[in-house]
C-alpha cells in the first residue's frame, strides 16, 4: 500500500454507482441519529440521566453535557481524520510536477475547517456544562460568570478544560490558515495534542492504576479518531472519490491505517476494561453490559474492515485502462480489436462499479455501528464503574503522591519480577519490533539481504526500552532516587546504542517503495524529517553532545524533575526527551543512517571522551551533594527502607559507574567502524587502480618526461634541421626505459 497507482489523480476512472451523493448526504445525519438513539437508551438504562439526590444539575447537566460530549468527540474525530488523510493518503496536487491542487485534497481541508470550527464551539459548550454538572444546583445561585471564572482558574478540572479549549482553537486557526503539506501536518499535530489532556481527565490521579488507565485511554482516543474520522471523511467526499483512477490505492492506504487503529482500540479498550471491571459479576452491572455491547460493536466493525480487505479493495480501480484505439490495417481486424477493447473496458467498469457499490454500503454500515459505539462511549463516561476510580479511604503517602500502590521492598530479583506496564510504551516497543521485522521480511521476499546483526541490535534496544519503561526500574523509579537514576542511565546511555546500530531509517528507505503520485507516506515523511534543518541541528555532533550532557544539569537542578514525577505527561516527556538525546548523540558517533552531519573519525573520539568525562563529574557531584534533589517527592515517599540522602548518593554512584560501560562500548564500536571504513577505502583505491591499469602512475611519469625534454632544449649549434628519425627513435626509446628517473646532475651535454 505504500506504492501508489501509476496513474495520476487527475486521471478519472469510471466506477460511479449513483449511490455516492446519497452517501455524502446521509453519512453525518445517519451517524447522529443512531448515536442519539443509542445514547438515549444507554443513559436511561444505566440511570446516568436520572436526577441525583444531592447537587443535581438538572436536565441541562444530565442531558446537555452528554449531547455536547457526543458532538465534541465526533467533531474531534472528523477534524483529525480528515487532516490525517490529507497528510498521508491523498496527493496534494494532481501530479508530481503539477501545481494544481487535487480536488479531493482541497475538499478534505474544507471538511477539516468545518469540523474544527464545530469542535471549538462544542469544546466551549462542554467546558461550561462541565462546570454546571460539577457545581450542581449551586451553578445558578449567585453570579454565574464569576463562579465559572473561578472554576476555570482555580479548579484543576476547569484549568485542564481551559487548556483543551485553547489548543483546539489554535489548531482550528492553523487548519484555516495553512495549505502546504508541512502546514497541514503541523495543524494535525496541534489538533492531536488535546488527546493527551483528555486522557488525563478520564481517570483520577489519586486512584490506583493511574498510569495504565491514562495510557490506555490516550491510545484508545488516538485509534478511534483516526479510524472514525477517516471513515466519515471518505463518505463526505464520496462523489469525487469514486471517479478517481487511484481509488483502490486510496482505499488501501486508509485500510492500513484503519487496521492499525483497530488494533490500538482493541488493546486499549481491553486494558481499560480490566481496570474498571473486576470479577465476572461486574460484567452484569449496567457498566459491564454497556461495555460488552460496545465491545460487540467494535468486533463487528473489525469484521467490516476485514470484508473491505478481502472482497472490495482488490476489485477497486487502481488505474482503469482506457479502450485501445484501432491501429492501421484491414477493416475487419480493426473492428475486432475495437470490439474486444470495448468489451474489456465494459467488464472492467462493471467490476469496479460493483466493488464501489459494495464499498459504500459497507461504509454506511460502519457509520451506523460507529454512531452507536461513540454514543455508548459517552454513556460509559457518565456511568460509575464497578471498580471505582477514586482514591482509597486511607491512602499511603506514596499513593497520595503517585496514585500507585507502594511496591514491596526492592531486591535484585524484584527488579526483574515487578512490572508496571505503560500502555503507551508497550505499543511503541511492540509496534516498532513488528514493523521492523515486516520490513526485513519484505526485503528478503524480493531477494535483498539485511544484516542479521542489525536486526538483533534493534530488537535488543527495544527490549531494553521496554524494561526501562515497564520493568522494575520504572516501578521503583518513583520510589527510590537510585532506581530512577538506573532507569535514566539505561534510557539515555544503553538503549540508544543498539537502536542506532539497527539503522531503522536505512531499512525504511530500502523496504518501502517511494510514492509516485505526489502523496507522502511514511517513507516520505520520515525522510523529510530526517533531512530537515531542525533534525540536522539537533543531530549535529556538538549540539548532540551539549544536549546529552547539559540536559542532565537542567533536569536535575532546575526543579523540572518534580513535574516528571508528579504528572503523567511530564513523565512521558522525560522518557521521550532523554531517549532522543541519547539517540542523537549515539547517531553522531556510531550511526550509519542518513541525515546526520558526522565529523571524521579522529574528531568523534575526543567528543565522546569529553562528553563522558562531564557525565562522570555529574555523577560525582550527586554523590557528594548534601541537598536532596526533588526532596519534596523522595523525602515524603514514606517507604522506610533507606534514608533519602543515602539513596541519592547511591544514585550518584550509579550515574558515575554505569556510564563507563557504554563509553567503552561506544569507543570500541567507533574503533571498529573506523577500521572498517579505512579497509573499505583501501580496497576501493586498489580496485580503482586495477581498473585503470596504473594509469595515474604512467601519467605522472609522462609528465616528468615532458619536463625533462623541455629542460634539455635544442642541441648546441643546431641549424634547425630535424633530427634523424633513427636518432629521435633511439632517444625516445632510452627515455621510455626509465621515465620515472629524473636526469642526473653532471650528465654530459648532447654531442654537437
Regions found by a protein language model. Give the residues of each.
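Polytopic transmembrane helical bundles with strong interfacial aromatic enrichment
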Residues: 1-416, 647-650, 654, 661, ...
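Hydrophobic core of alpha-helical transmembrane segments in multi-pass integral membrane proteins
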Residues: 31-43, 168-173, 193, 375-376, ...
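Early transmembrane hairpin module of multi-pass membrane proteins
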Residues: 63, 69-71, 77, 112, ...
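Juxtamembrane membrane-water interface segments of multi-pass membrane proteins
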Residues: 84-109, 232-253, 274-283, 307-333, ...
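Functional transmembrane alpha-helices
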Residues: 200-205, 209-242, 272-275, 290-305, ...
Amino acid at each position: 500500500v505504500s506504492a501508489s497507482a501509476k496513474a495520476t489523480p487527475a486521471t478519472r476512472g469510471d466506477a460511479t454507482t449513483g449511490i455516492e451523493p446519497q452517501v455524502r448526504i446521509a453519512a453525518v445525519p445517519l451517524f447522529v441519529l443512531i448515536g442519539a438513539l443509542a445514547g438515549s437508551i444507554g443513559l436511561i438504562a444505566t440511570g446516568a440521566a436520572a436526577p441525583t439526590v444531592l447537587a443535581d444539575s438538572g436536565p441541562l447537566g444530565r442531558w446537555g453535557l452528554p449531547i455536547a460530549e457526543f458532538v465534541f468527540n465526533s467533531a474531534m474525530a472528523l477534524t483529525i481524520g480528515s487532516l490525517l488523510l490529507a497528510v498521508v493518503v491523498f496527493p496534494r496536487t494532481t501530479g508530481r510536477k503539477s501545481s494544481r491542487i487535487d480536488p479531493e485534497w482541497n475538499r478534505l481541508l474544507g471538511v477539516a475547517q468545518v469540523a474544527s470550527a464545530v469542535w471549538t464551539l462544542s469544546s466551549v459548550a462542554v467546558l461550561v456544562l462541565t462546570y454546571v454538572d460539577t457545581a450542581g444546583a449551586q451553578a445558578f445561585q449567585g453570579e454565574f460568570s464569576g463562579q465559572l471564572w473561578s472554576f476555570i482558574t482555580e479548579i484543576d478540572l476547569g484549568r485542564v478544560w481551559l487548556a483543551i479549549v485553547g489548543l483546539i482553537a489554535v489548531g482550528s486557526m492553523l487548519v484555516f490558515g495553512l495549505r502546504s503539506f508541512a502546514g497541514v501536518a503541523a495543524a494535525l499535530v496541534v489538533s492531536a495534542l488535546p488527546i493527551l489532556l483528555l486522557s488525563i481527565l478520564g481517570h483520577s490521579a489519586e486512584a490506583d492504576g493511574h498510569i495504565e488507565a491514562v495510557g490506555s485511554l490516550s491510545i484508545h482516543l488516538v485509534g478511534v479518531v483516526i479510524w472514525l474520522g477517516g471513515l466519515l471523511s471518505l463518505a463526505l467526499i464520496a462523489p469525487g472519490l469514486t471517479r478517481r483512477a487511484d481509488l483502490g490505492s486510496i482505499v488501501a492506504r486508509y485500510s492500513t491505517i484503519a487496521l492499525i487503529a483497530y488494533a490500538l482500540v482493541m488493546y486499549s479498550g481491553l486494558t481499560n476494561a480490566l481496570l474498571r471491571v473486576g470479577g465476572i459479576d461486574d460484567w452484569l452491572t449496567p457498566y459491564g453490559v454497556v461495555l460488552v455491547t460496545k465491545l460487540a460493536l467494535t468486533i463487528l466493525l473489525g469484521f467490516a474492515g476485514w470484508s473491505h480487505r478481502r472482497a472490495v479493495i482488490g476489485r477497486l480501480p487502481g488505474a482503469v485502462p482506457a479502450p485501445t484505439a484501432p491501429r492501421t490495417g484491414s477493416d475487419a481486424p480493426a473492428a475486432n480489436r475495437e470490439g474486444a477493447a470495448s468489451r474489456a473496458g465494459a467488464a472492467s467498469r462493471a467490476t469496479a462499479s460493483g466493488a464501489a457499490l459494495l464499498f459504500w454500503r459497507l461504509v454506511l454500515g460502519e457509520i451506523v455501528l460507529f454512531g452507536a459505539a461513540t454514543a455508548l462511549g459517552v454513556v460509559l463516561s457518565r456511568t460509575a464503574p464497578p471498580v471505582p476510580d477514586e482514591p482509597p479511604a486511607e491512602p499511603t503517602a506514596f499513593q497520595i503522591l503517585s496514585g500507585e500502590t507502594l511496591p514491596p521492598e526492592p531486591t535484585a530479583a524484584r527488579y526483574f519480577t515487578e512490572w508496571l506496564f505503560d500502555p503507551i510504551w508497550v505499543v511503541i516497543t511492540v509496534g516498532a519490533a513488528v514493523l521492523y521485522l515486516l520490513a526485513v521480511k519484505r526485503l528478503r521476499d524480493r531477494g535483498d539481504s539485511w544484516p542479521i546483526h542489525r536486526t538483533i541490535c534493534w530488537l535488543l534496544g527495544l527490549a531494553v526500552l521496554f524494561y526501562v519503561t515497564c520493568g522494575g526500574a520504572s516501578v521503583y523509579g518513583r520510589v527510590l532516587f537510585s532506581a530512577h537514576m538506573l532507569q535514566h542511565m539505561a534510557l539515555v546511555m544503553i538503549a540508544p546504542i543498539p537502536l542506532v546500530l539497527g539503522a531503522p531509517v536505512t531499512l525504511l528507505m530500502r523496504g518501502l517503495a517511494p510514492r509516485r503520485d505526489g502523496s507522502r507516506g511514511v517513507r516520505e515523511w520520515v525522510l523529510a524529517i530526517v533531512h530537515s534543518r531542525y533534525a540536522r541541528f539537533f543531530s549535529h555532533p556538538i549540539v548532540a553532545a551539549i544536549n546529552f550532557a547539559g540536559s542532565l544539569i537542567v533536569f536535575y537542578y532546575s526543579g523540572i524533575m518534580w513535574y516528571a514525577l508528579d504528572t503523567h505527561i511530564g513523565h512521558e516527556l522525560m522518557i521521550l526527551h532523554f531517549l532522543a538525546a541519547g539517540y542523537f548523540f549515539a547517531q553522531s558517533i556510531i550511526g550509519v543512517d542518513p541525515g546526520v552531519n558526522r565529523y571524521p573519525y579522529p574528531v568523534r573520539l575526543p567528543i565522546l571522551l569529553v562528553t563522558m568525562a562531564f557525565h562522570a563529574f555529574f555523577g560525582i557531584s550527586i554523590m557528594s551533594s548534601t541537598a536532596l534533589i526533588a526532596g519534596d517527592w523522595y523525602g515524603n515517599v514514606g517507604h522506610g527502607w533507606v534514608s533519602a540522602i543515602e539513596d541519592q548518593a547511591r544514585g550518584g554512584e550509579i550515574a558515575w559507574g554505569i556510564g563507563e560501560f557504554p563509553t567503552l562500548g561506544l569507543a570500541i564500536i567507533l574503533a571498529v567502524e573506523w577500521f572498517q571504513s579505512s579497509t573499505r577505502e583501501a580496497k576501493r583505491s586498489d580496485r580503482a587502480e586495477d581498473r585503470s591499469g596504473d594509469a595515474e602512475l604512467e601519467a605522472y611519469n609522462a609528465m616528468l618526461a615532458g619536463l625533462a625534454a623541455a629542460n634539455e632544449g635544442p642541441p648546441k649549434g643546431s641549424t634547425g634541421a630535424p633530427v634523424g628519425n633513427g636518432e629521435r627513435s633511439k632517444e625516445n626509446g632510452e627515455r621510455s626505459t626509465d621515465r620515472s628517473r629524473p636526469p642526473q646532475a653532471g650528465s654530459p651535454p648532447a654531442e654537437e
